Amino acid sequence: MTVWNGTKEPFILKIKQKRSRLGSLLRIYKVFLPRNLNEKTLDAIFSNSFFSSDAKVVSMYGGGVLSIGDRCLIHGSIVLERAASKIEIGENSFLGFSSTLNSRKAISIGNNVLIAEQCLIQDHNSHAIDYQTRRNDINLAIARQVGNPKMDKDFSQVIEHPIHIGNDCWIGYRSIILKGVTIGDRSIIAAGSVVTNSLPSDVIAAGNPAKIVKKLN
């Protein structure tokens, strides 16, 4: 497993890979890099896992910790929303096309986990329950678009709790895993499910909200 401790500056990492004339795999980074992060460092971090040309790692405000085990295949996006964010992916795991891991707290994914296409795993609510606070979120988003990127959103009223997905789980197409959820080992989430509560090991869950439909053992 390799671990990256985030820089103090925001960055976006876009990974591309191609074969050289001799057949060896080359890694190409299209990235906005702070000065203290270079391609040699990135190679050391990601050398044991494969990132497709669609993969993206984003540190929105700088910082965060990303751990990725050996023999992983990443097609989607990994987003570290603040310096305290932590995302851990175990060995031999898969993140499908257009799927997103979005963390302000912590997301932990075990070994041999399959996450299908267009899934969302997010450990926070994004916005406050209070409507007036949400109005301000819109104003801030507009301000960033017109040249005030340093205006910070107030996350003090946004609820966040860590997510844990156990070993050998399968998260089906377009499923959503919300804050505070733990999914036990070997469990399966059916396509299109929204998981709002924790689930034990060895079950199949489906629906919105997801409920156990079958026990595997």
Residue ranges and their predicted role:
Residues 181:
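Extracellular carbohydrate recognition
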Residues 1-129, 134-144, 149-151, 155-168, ...:
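Domain-scale signature associated with acetyltransferase and cell-envelope carbohydrate enzymes
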Residues 188-194:
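A generic "structured core" feature
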Residues 184-187, 200-202:
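Conserved catalytic segment of ABC-fold P-loop ATPases
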Residues 114, 187-188:
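Short alpha-helix at the nucleotide-sugar/activated-sugar donor binding site of glycosyltransferases
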